[in-house]
Amino acid sequence: MNIYLIINHENQRIQNLIDKYHLKHDENSSMALIMNSNSLELYDRSKPRNKSIKVNFSSKKNNYRCLNFKKKNEILYKAIGIKKNYFPSVLDATAGLGQDSFLISFLGCYVIMMEYHPVIAALLTDGLERGYKDEKIGFWLKKRLHLIYDNSLNILNIPISQPDVIYLDPMYPINKKKSLPKKNMQFLRKLANKDDQSKNLLKVARKFAKKRVVVKRPSYANPISDEKVDFIISNKYHRFDIYLPFKKK
């Protein structure tokens, strides 16, 4: 994968990530990776006024969301199927920058993130490595949140345990009536493959999940497939379309 590389500081851990994901410098790439003293950040060179982004599981935003979590108001809790003494294993097949995966793991679930894009995988790995060492979250994060670098469409051929739940959060369709998506989403849209594999991924997920497949959608969007949604959990801003696994013949 070619991308513009900016080396602000020499850091062997960060360099190892660059090598691991075979990231090569491209002078003409509009997207850049910044190698800082202890983090890897993504930057859009075509929009120099925008700040760079990184995966930071110990950020103030994550801390706030966790500390102010209320079960009755958090539809993600219900969508995943978490109960008092039941914490399903979860495969996040569209990890992105790992925000929902982090919250699901905070709630007590064992979560595996899958990401096929080398730049995003490098950002996630950097975030995990720093998170594992964090004094506040490291002790539980290293037990519950992990990453597999592969295409989620291959899950039937990967030697991993069947998860109770497969979580899908495909790219939201652009709503022309609203302002541009948040910066993180704009960055991901620029990096990601434009081919929408959501329908195929849903079919594969329904073959592999034990209990349910959870698809996150904005309130204004249609389901990702013509397949029947078994039930829906929603609030004002977004909803979760829940699909049960295919019955084995």
Curated annotation (Swiss-Prot):
UniProt enzyme class: transferase
Residues binding S-adenosyl-L-methionine, per UniProt: 169
Coiled-coil regions listed: none
GO molecular function annotation: rRNA (guanine-N2-)-methyltransferase activity
Subcellular location: Cytoplasm
One Pfam family matching this protein: SAM_MT
Family to which this protein belongs: Belongs to the methyltransferase superfamily. RsmJ family.
Entry function: Specifically methylates the guanosine in position 1516 of 16S rRNA.
UniProt protein name: Ribosomal RNA small subunit methyltransferase J
